[in-house]
Amino acid sequence: MQCRRQVRMCWPLLGTALLLLLPGPPLSCAQNVSEYQVKAAYLYNFSKFVEWPAQAFASPVAPIRLCVLKEQAFESELNQVVKGKMVGGRAVTVVPVQTAEQSLGCQILFIASSQDKQSRQIIDTLRNTSVLTVGESEGFLERGGIINFVLQDDRVQLQVNHKAATQAGLHISSRLLSVAKLVIQ
């Protein structure tokens, strides 16, 4: 009798566990996923598909620094994505920056469209460094930026300036290049 009672008590728990295992809606259908959440996930994943020269880091165990230029809302979104994550044995950290000079120790720098007027000067300052510059504005690649986010049909798409990446000493994985909507050789 006691066994039956225990089994009956387990059914609700088993049912709940099975519901949790069912797949949810695809990411593209999820209404609560913001554009910045998608871009933050991309930035984190760039750290997995881009190789930097050894001199781009202060030491062999230095973290991968994802820097955000003057954009607190995006910075907090990115912090949520990378919290506690490691890539290639390195911790991933988010660093707010205010100037191009502060970006010199970064591996990735995100320049929001709100900072578009500064982007040319920042890209010029970082041109001969191994900083992966990522933007979200028209003409970003033409100014020498390396990766640009564009919205098309409510989807975040990538454009890549492979030539600028090579000049910066960065190696972008063919897997990342294959998902780009546009690649400038």
PLM regions: where:
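Short hydrophobic alpha-helices and adjacent helix-cap/hinge residues
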Residues: 2-185
